[in-house]
Amino acid sequence: MRILFFGTAFISETYLKELHKKCHEIFVVTTPDKPALRGQKLIYPAVKVYAVKNNISFIQPEKFTLDVIETIKNFAADTGVAVAYGKLIPKVVFDIPKYKTFNIHFSLLPKYKGAAPVQHALCRGETETGISSFYIEEGLDTGGIIIQEKLNISIKDNAETLLNKLILLGIDVMNKTLELFRCGKCDAASQTGDPSFAPSLKKIDGLVNWNKRAGEIYNQFRGLYLWPGIYSTISQGKLVGKRIKFREIEVFDSDSINKDSGIVYSAEKNRGFTVSCAVGRILVVKMQSENKPVVSAWDFIQGRQISAGDRF
């Protein structure tokens, strides 16, 4: 098939590789290069890097001008596939291919519409998620569902492990969707159920609210594992004012009622230290203070950098 592929990030690259492996004819639309944080060097989108290496035609439009639209039309695509493109695709573009354009979304729509469905599902303690292939419309993730497949979420899953599972499931859903189109089947079902939203993450999302239950804080850790991580500032103790990132935590107990929350409660030999929550306690296993390497929480408390009774 002739496929118009919209994608940018490393996730998108995995899907482009799959299409290339299947010997489809591909034309890539990706985002412009971005300047590095320091210096003048430009960072290429992962999809562009793969396209250049494999002699796949691509464009990087800032906007979908008339010339860009004409270039896309001239490719005469059978369908369009969008995976983590990162920009809105206008109707005049997504309607160009014979079978329109579909998106691979990492949730069971209409749940978790938006840019960060995996992270928000984990933060809210969901036990099930999945992949949706759906036709792109002008609304946010509102189009008709072509295929949905479910995936159970393990309590040990974090954003990295769950994302890896969903990437593989999404590739399977993409291939099944393309096979439907190849057979001339392009039906879709309207989305049903109450929608929920998964907006882009911000650094402040990682701030721990100790007045929550231990399980809720653990879910926050799981969801924000890749970025921005979870953190808190010491408000009472030797390191007052220092921000601590929690690199590995566990639920130590889930139902104790604590008079105060955010208190370093106990040292647990060779494991770390516990912190009280509104209900329950978390066990800090690995941590990182500002501008320092990641260390064992047990070693940190042994070094008397933090003590029972200190407060976050």
UniProtKB/Swiss-Prot annotation:
Reactions catalysed according to its record: L-methionyl-tRNA(fMet) + (6R)-10-formyltetrahydrofolate = N-formyl-L-methionyl-tRNA(fMet) + (6S)-5,6,7,8-tetrahydrofolate + H(+)
GO molecular function: methionyl-tRNA formyltransferase activity
Gene Ontology CC: one annotated term: cytosol
Enzyme class: transferase
Keyword Transferase: yes
UniProtKB keywords: Protein biosynthesis, Transferase
InterPro entries per the UniProt record, alphabetical: Fmt, Formyl_trans_C, Formyl_transf_N, Formyl_transf_N_sf, Formyl_transferase-like_C_sf, Met-tRNA-FMT_C, Met-tRNA-FMT_N
UniProt: (6S)-5,6,7,8-tetrahydrofolate binding residues: 107-110
Similarity field: Belongs to the Fmt family.
Protein name: Methionyl-tRNA formyltransferase
Species: Endomicrobium trichonymphae
